[in-house]
Amino acid sequence: MARDKEDQNNENPSIVQNMSFPFNTIFLISSAIFLVTAAFWFVAVMTLHYRTDECNRFVTTPGIFISFSLLAMSLTGFYAAYFKSDCLFRIHFFIFFLWMFVVVSKAIFVIFLHKETNPRLFPGTKIYEFRYEDYSGWVSRLVIKDDEWYRTRRCLVKDNVCNRLNHKMPASEFYQMNLTPIQSGCCKPPLSCGLNYEKPNNWTVSRYYNNLEVDCKRWNNSADTLCFDCDSCKAVIIADVHNTSFSITVNIIHIIFSLCIGMTGWFAWLRILRESQK
């Protein structure tokens, strides 16, 4: 009787296979969803990239790389699961490991950036100031490239980031303003310079002038100069990258989600290999 049952199982191998978890089906569905999403994102980013000016392309350029990587990974994963192709699975996981390397590296960078972004509240005001020297050398070099700073500077001037501070206001009102990081670092001199306040973008030398600080010498009342050449301006650009990056929690969730999809694909691949050996 036991032999009859064994023969029945051999005649109906699909019963045993159907009892196992359907990793291949789940991976096929998830890859299809990823494929549609990545394709839509890729088209949207490419369209936005060619419609924006040079100043905004530093945002869309990484988006092209990310969306193309997701598109390639999803496409190979979908066809690998659909055709049960060992070769396509290998290509898929090669792209997946590259993707995970980028995601983990970005998460580490965000953690370091979060630890080093520490604005100081200037006494007696509501103005926070940023210091370029607070950032590690590798962090500052990664975000701020000296040979490309002129492009960033030109874009800041072109976008009129300091326009809000053009009108005259009392010093007491200015010192209680909630300035954005760029307004604080690029549109006014460091308050430690000891300059006399005339209006937000106009300051004059006083007897308390601090000529030892390099940024104090770089300040100019000209609308095309202001503090765009200051280290404080470079510091707030780094801080702005921190503010526009995903939070640490979101990065961790992103890593966990990617690993779950990757493990599902891995088990689907193992099952296909096992079936091909039978």
Swiss-Prot record:
It comes from the Eukaryota. Residues 1-25, 84-92, 271-278 are cytoplasmic. Disulfide bonds: none annotated. InterPro entries: TET_plant, Tetraspanin/Peripherin. GO terms for biological process: auxin-activated signaling pathway; lateral root development; primary root development. Belongs to the tetraspanin (TM4SF) family. May be involved in the regulation of cell differentiation. This is Tetraspanin-13. It comes from Arabidopsis thaliana (Mouse-ear cress). The lineage of its organism: Eukaryota, Viridiplantae, Streptophyta, Embryophyta, Tracheophyta.
